[in-house]
A protein has these predicted regions:
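N- and C-terminal low-complexity/disordered segments
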Residues: 1-7
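Short, charge-rich amphipathic segments
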Residues: 2, 17-29
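Nucleic acid-binding interface residues in structured DNA/RNA-binding domains
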Residues: 7-19, 70-183
Length: 183
């Protein structure tokens, strides 16, 4: 659940893939959304302060490096807001190497093992991945369906493909599904 009592600062970033809204509080970056994407800034308070902060400046610097096709060697201060389960999924996303991909099922297996469970739902993982509010930096675009389907990116499948191409990920066997978002 979002903490809507903290002051939220915002800045825009013009990327090669479209305009991005960045949001941060005093702790770190809370959101990074392409204008108009699914779940766009939905948990932010209406009253926002358009002002640069350390976290926003670092996020902009990170994006500058990233959009040149290079892997940034630092992370801006992050403050993703979500349940313990979502936080666990987002932590796994941060471990996916630049230019590589994993599946929803593999993340589910990893989390199940860590929690001492025999199994975990890939669909539950997909829900947490889909609600990542710090896209690109917390790289939800690096998660694909088990069959290679490029599904479930709130910024749009076309952007997901472009982000993976920018990272020079091996796209062999990947495809855009005709409909649905099966994991």
């Amino acid at each position: 659940m979002a903490n809507n009592t903290a002051a939220v600062f915002t800045r825009h970033y013009d990327s090669p893939m479209g305009r991005i809204l960045l949001a941060a509080d005093e702790i770190g970056l809370r959101g990074l959304w392409f204008d108009g994407q699914k779940y766009f800034a939905r948990d932010l308070p209406e009253k926002r302060i358009e002002q640069e902060t350390h976290a926003l400046a670092e996020a902009r610097r990170w994006l500058d490096v990233y959009f040149t096709g290079k892997e940034p060697d630092f992370l801006p201060p992050l403050h993703p807001i979500g349940s313990a389960f979502r936080q666990a999924v987002w932590t796994v996303l941060l471990q996916i190497p630049y230019g590589q991909t994993t599946t929803y099922g593999e993340i589910a297996r990893q989390l199940a093992g860590t929690a001492g469970l025999s199994r975990m739902s890939a669909q539950a993982v997909g829900g947490a991945v889909g609600h990542n509010e710090i896209s690109i930096i917390i790289p939800c675009h690096r998660v694909v369906g088990t069959s290679g389907s490029l599904t479930g990116y709130a910024g749009g499948i076309e952007r997901k493909v472009k982000l993976l191409e920018l990272e020079r990920a091996d796209m062999t066997g990947f495809f855009v599904p005709k409909k649905g978002t099966a994991l």
